[in-house]
Amino acid sequence: MKRLLLLFCALILTGGLYAQDIRALIANAGDSNDYPSAGKITIFDTTLVDVQETGLSYVHIHKLDKILTAKGALDLSVIKYGYDPLSAYVDIKMVKVHHSDGRTTDFDVTQVIDYPAPARAIYWGAREKMLEIGRLYPGDAVEVVFFKKGYTYALLAGEEDDERYIPPMRGHYYDIVEFFSNEPVLEKCYEVIIPSSKELQYEFYNGEVRSSVKFREDTKIYSFTKKDIMPMKRESGMVAWSDVAPKLLLSTSPDWYAKSRWFYGVNEDFGSFESTPEIDAKVNEILKDAKDEMDSIAKLTHWCADEIRYSGISMGEGEGYTLHTGEMTFTDRCGVCKDKAGMLITMLRAAGFKSYAAMTMAGSRIDYIPADQFNHSITVVQLHNGEYMILDPTWVPFVRELWSSREQQQNYLMGLPEGADLMETPISPPENHYLYINGNSEIKNNGTLTGTFTIEAEGQSDAAVRGVFTYAPIATWHDNLEKELLKVSPNAILKEVTHTKNSDYQNTPVKMTYTYEIPNYAMVTEDEVIFTPFVAKGVYQRAMGHLYTNTSYEERVYPFRTGCSLLLEMNEEVKLPKYKEVVYLPEAEAVSGKGADYSGSYEVSKRILTFNQKVTIKKRIFQPEDWSSFKTAVNNQRYMMEEPVILAR
C-alpha cells in the first residue's frame, strides 16, 4: 500500500505538475521565430519507472510537443510506438490535442491500431501501436501518456501474467536514456523508483544533468533532469550520436564479470550448443582436409558464414539473448547473428574446441556501466595455447577474415564460465588490407590509350574488390568487371580480363588483370599532350572508402570513422608519344600523421612517365585531432585523380 501511495505521489510530481497549467506552458514555449530550424519542440518529456524486486519495470511516460511548422504538424499527425510482444507491453493511455485557439480534443484510445511492424531479414513478430490524429497546425500541441512494462531486449518468454516482462537477468534492472534529440526539448525528466535492497549504479555521459536521490522506508528514488536540450549539428561520417551526445546509463548489475557469467549460464542451461549425429558428420566432412588448428577454425567459421543464410524467423521462446540450438539452425539453414554464432559454437565444440558466445555493439561504443548495450552476437574460441580468439560468421561471408576488421576498435563481452571484463578489438594494421594496383600503358599519336593493369587485394580490400562477384549472379560477372573500367572512362573497351577463382577465396587473395583500349583518352595535338594516367584516376574506387569522405570541414568536433584501415599502393608506367618538354607534372605534398599517410609523385625519363602513389589509412575510428592528416591524404589522392600531366610537342 505504501509503495502504491509513493508511486501515486511521484506521478503527481512528474506529470500532474505539468497538467496544472498546460496552456501556459504551451503559450510560453516559443514559436518558429525562437526556433527557426525546428518543426516542433518538446515542452516536457517525463518518464517514471517503478522497478520491482524481480527487475520488472512499470514505465509511465508523459510528453507534450508543440508544433511550429507544417513539417512538425506532419510529423505529429500519427502517434506510433514499436514494441516486441514477447518482452514488452505498451498501452497508449491518453492522447489530447491542445489547439492554438484554446480548444482541446481528446482522442478515443480504444481506436489505437495494433499491427505487425514492417520487417526485413528479421521477422521476430515485432509490432507497432498507432493512432491517427489527423491534420494539425502550427501552434497546436499534442499531449500523450504512455504506459509500458518489460524491457528492450528479448530472452525467454514466460508463461503467464507479467513473467514474460521480467528482464533476462532476473532481479536486475538497467536502462539507457538518451538526453539528446533532433528537435529542441525544453525539459526532460527521468525518475526511477527502486527497492532499497538493490544497488543502482549510474553515470551520465557527454554532458551534465541535475540529479538527486531520495530515500524512503523501502525504496530509493533517483531523479535526473536536463533543461534546454538543443539539437546537435551532425557531421558527415561522425560516430554514433550515443558516443558523443548526453546519455544516462543505469544498472543494478554489479559489473561486466557478472553479466559475462550470466550470459554463459543462460545459454548452457538452454542447451544451445548441443550437437547431433548429423552435425557431427558435417563437422567431420568439413575438417577432413584441415591442416592444423587455425585451418580447422577457419573452415568451420566460413561454412557457418557462407551456408547459413541471414534470415530471422521468430521461434517464440528463445529470441534475444538465448541462442537457438545448433540443431534448429542446422536444420533451417538460416538465422540471424546469434544463430550463426551459435551454429559455429556447436560445430567448434563438436570438433573438440572450447567455444563460447559473446556479445558486441556494431556501430557504437559500449560504455562501462554494465547496461545491456548490445546488438550483435559473435563467437569465441579458446586456442590450444589458452588464448581466446573472436570470430564473426555473420560479417565474413566470402571474406578472407575470421573476424571482420570493419569491427575493429569495437567493444565486446565474452560469456565465459569464469566471467570476463569488457574488452575492445584492436586496430587492424593497414597492411592486412592492402590494395595494389599496377599498370602499364601507352598513349598513341591519335590519343588512344592501350594498356593493362593488375589489382591485388587482401582482407577487407579483397572483399570490396571481390564484391563484383559476391553480390551478383554469375551471369553478370563479366558486365560487372567491365563497369569498373567504364566508371573511369565511358569510352573504354575491355579486351580481356583474367581473375582468380572466386569460390577459392579462402585459399587465394583476389587478383585481376585487365587488358583494355580507350579511344580519345588523351588530348594529343600538334602543340601538346594532356592526360591523367589511368591508374591515377582511381579504378576500383569500390575498395577506397576513404574517397567518399566529406572533407569540407576545416576541423572536426566529433570523432569520425571510415570502413576499415587500408594500405593503397598505385603504380603505373606510361609510354608517351613524342614530345619536346614537360610543361606540368602534378605535385602533392607528402603527409604523415596519426590518421593517415600520403605520398605521391611523377617522374619522366625520356618517353616513360612513372606514377607512384601510396595512401595509408591507419584505423577505422578517428579522433578529431586525426582529421588534418586524414583530410590531406584524401584530398591529395583526389587531386592526383583530377590534375592532368601536360607535355609540349
Show where each model-derived region lies.
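Single-residue recognition of alpha-helix boundary sites
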Residues: L13-T14, W403
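Sec/Tat signal peptide C-region and signal peptidase I cleavage site
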Residues: G15-A19
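A sensor for short, sequence-defined functional sites
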Residues: Q20-R649
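Sec-dependent N-terminal signal peptides
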Residues: L4-L13, L344
